[in-house]
């Protein structure tokens, strides 16, 4: 049985940039053991981070070539799901994008893959699979 995991933008950026935790993310992407998900907001977070750091062309390449080629399902948001993220934002000092990642993990009952220590603020509300 496959396990579901939700990727935070941190995980995909680590993979793309070869930063800390990138090997684990690469293994997850290559493994048939996990269904990998990312919220659309967090995929956009990867896009704008790449655009700022490396330019719009590289960000567009990620969006149009790399992301569609990865075994990752992009999860869109209904209004109710946006409100779930807003409730987390109201209760915790996290970025709104991080709240979407957390809300997706909670809704999907799946661990959130990240190395972003900001998620420690959520305590046990989210099961985090920490990247080293």
What is each PLM-predicted segment?
Residues 35, 71-73, 127-129:
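Conserved beta-strand segments of alpha/beta enzyme cores
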Residues 20, 41-42, 77-80, 100, ...:
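Short beta->alpha linker loops
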Residues 2-4, 102-132:
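Acidic, PIN/NYN-like endoribonuclease modules and their adjacent C-terminal/linker elements
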Residues 72-113:
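Active-site neighborhoods of divalent-metal-dependent phosphate/nucleic-acid chemistry enzymes
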Residues 1-38, 51-65, 131:
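Short, well-structured N-terminal submotif of metal-dependent ribonuclease cores
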Residues 12-13, 43, 119-120:
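A generic structural signal for short hydrophobic patches within well-formed alpha-helices
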Residues 8, 45, 98, 116:
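Acidic active-site catalytic centers that drive phospho-/nucleotidyl reactions
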């Amino acid at each position: 049985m496959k396990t579901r995991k939700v990727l935070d933008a941190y995980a995909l950026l680590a993979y793309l940039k070869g930063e800390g935790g990138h090997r684990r993310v690469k293994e997850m992407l290559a493994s048939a053991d996990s269904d990998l998900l990312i919220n659309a907001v967090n995929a956009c977070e990867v896009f704008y981070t790449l655009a700022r750091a490396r330019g719009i062309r590289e960000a567009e390449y990620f969006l149009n070539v790399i992301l569609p080629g990865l075994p990752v399902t992009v999860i869109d948001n209904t209004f109710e799901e946006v409100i779930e993220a807003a409730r987390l934002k109201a209760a915790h000092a996290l970025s709104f994008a991080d709240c979407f990642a957390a809300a997706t993990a909670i809704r999907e009952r799946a661990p959130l893959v990240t190395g972003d220590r900001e998620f420690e603020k959520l305590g046990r509300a989210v099961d985090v699979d920490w990247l080293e």
